[in-house]
Structures are given as C-alpha cells and as structure tokens.
Regions:
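Extracytoplasmic beta-strand/coil segments of soluble accessory domains associated
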Residues: 38-86, 103
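Transmembrane beta-barrel wall of Gram-negative outer-membrane proteins
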Residues: 143-168, 184-222
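Outer-envelope beta-barrel architecture signal
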Residues: 73-75, 101, 134-138, 158-162, ...
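Short acidic/polar hinge/loop motifs at secondary-structure boundaries
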Residues: 36-38, 82-109
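Structural signature of outer-membrane beta-barrel domains
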Residues: 17-19, 72, 84, 129, ...
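N-terminal periplasmic accessory domains that precede
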Residues: 1-2, 46-49, 65, 92-98, ...
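Extracellular loop and loop/strand-boundary signature of outer-membrane beta-barrel proteins
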Residues: 89, 135-137, 181-188, 225
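Short, acidic, small-residue-rich periplasmic hinge/interaction motif at the N-terminus
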Residues: 1-38, 47, 72-74
Length: 225
C-alpha cells in the first residue's frame, strides 16, 4: 500500500557573497590628515591637499588642479552632491571649503559613473559633517588671516542634528596701517580685502539606513581700494 504523509514546511535559503569592487581610481583622503599638511598662513586648504595626490598636477599659486591632461573646468566638484562652479577665493589663493565643516573628501580620477556627467577629468566629492546628535559642541579658532567658528548639536537627540560653521578673513584690518603709511601724505586709502564662508546643515535620521538632510553654503569675496 502507498501512504502519503504531510510534513512541515522546508525552507531553503542561500546568501550571495558580497563582492567588494575595488575602484583603483578612487582616493579617499581623511580630513584629519588634510589638517596636518602645512598650509599657507596656517589656513587649511582641501584643494591644495588634493594637488599633492599622485596623478594630479597644479599651477603655482592657484586652487585649480589638472587630472589626466584636462583643465580645471573638467573637474566636477560636488559639495553634498551639489556642483560648485567657483571653488576659490581671492583669485585662487584659498579654496571655498572650510575644513572644520567637512566630513569626507573623495577624488575619482577616471572611470566614474555616468551620473557624474559633463566632465572629462575627475570628480571631487566633499561631504559636510552631519552635526553632533548627542550633545552641543562649539569651537572658535583665531588664525593669522582668519577666524572660524563651529557650532553643532542635537535638535532631537539621536534623531535630528545641526551644524553651523563660518570663517572670515581680516586681511583688510591687518594691511590697513601699511597701506595708509604708503599712501600720499594728506590722503587716506581704505583697503577692502576679505572673504567669508558660511556652511549650515540639518540632518534627520529616518531609520538606520535612511536619512534626509538640508545643507546650505554662502560665501563672498570683497576687493576694493
């Protein structure tokens, strides 16, 4: 006799191996390492640090860089995914990126995905910090040519955070006595030479793998006599 039996459910599961594809043209530069590089007048400059990487050429005294024979305009520079078309202050002496507000720096020198279109040489991705989600923290720095401040903290603890960071140079204040001393007796010359940057970001964690953020940047150069 043939009898049938009902058995419990049998589940067969398999897991695919995660293959990590190494992209040889991608270089990630730790921001803490960038801060240890000697800088002009003590002003940490991310673009100047990029110019020191292998496969990258630069011109003396400018913040532009050349990759694979292309000009500076063939480098796509992104700040939190948004293109930055003018990445320098005062004619290229300093870059517009405040290192105190930056979380990560990645340079892709070739073979970058199609979503980074419109450029031939490289893609420079700069991501801002997300802010401290546990406690408030503030920093204030006085340098040779500029002062900087950073304020970050939670809006909703462990959920929503913010960061505000800014800097302003005071080259005009330092140089004013020397300019007036060199001017014609009986006349005064007002030197206007400074720039400022302001970065702000609000980050909200939706889940462990998802988040939404709003980031903003503004800056200005002022030059006049």
């Amino acid at each position: 006799d043939i009898e049938s039996f009902t058995v419990g459910e049998i589940q067969v599961r398999g897991e695919a191996n995660i293959i990590n594809k190494t992209q040889t043209s991608l270089i990630e530069v730790p921001i803490e390492q960038i801060k240890t590089i000697p800088a002009l007048l003590g002003e940490v400059d991310i673009i100047k640090a990029i110019q020191l990487l292998p496969g990258v050429q630069s011109s003396e005294g400018t913040s532009g860089f050349y990759v694979r024979g292309g000009g500076p305009d063939q480098n796509l520079i992104l700040l939190d995914g948004v293109p930055v078309y003018n990445a320098s202050h005062i004619g290229g002496i300093f870059s517009v990126f405040n290192a105190d507000a930056v979380k990560s720096v990645r340079l892709t020198k070739g073979g970058f995905p199609a979503r980074f279109g419109g450029r031939l040489s490289s893609v420079l991705q700069i991501d801002m910090k997300e802010g401290n989600s546990k406690q408030f923290k503030g920093d204030f720095t006085v340098g040779l040519v500029s002062s900087k401040f950073t304020l970050e903290g939670p809006i909703i603890k462990d959920k929503t955070s913010f960061i505000i960071s800014g800097r302003r140079t005071y080259i005009d204040l330092i140089a004013a006595p020397f300019v007036n001393a060199a001017s014609t007796p009986g006349s005064s010359t007002d030197l206007i030479l400074y720039f400022y940057d302001l970065n702000a970001k609000i980050n909200h964690k939706i889940s462990k793998k998802n988040r939404i953020f709003f980031s903003a940047y503004t800056g200005k150069d002022k030059l006049g006599i």
